[in-house]
């Protein structure tokens, strides 16, 4: 049976833990992509499996099934 043009395949999802909470997110996200997916803008410190991910590497480090991430969103103030 041919596919309909308006139907799309669902995006595969993976199970991870973010700040102690289980989540399912799209497969193939980088750490930066995960931050965007979660709606976190600006600076954020991210630890992946107990290892800090430098900000310069957040766009290249992939989030993988079973990862445990701790995210601290940095905000300014006075």
What residue ranges belong to the model's regions?
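Ubiquitin-like/PB1-type beta-grasp interaction modules and other compact soluble beta-rich domains
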Residues: 1-77
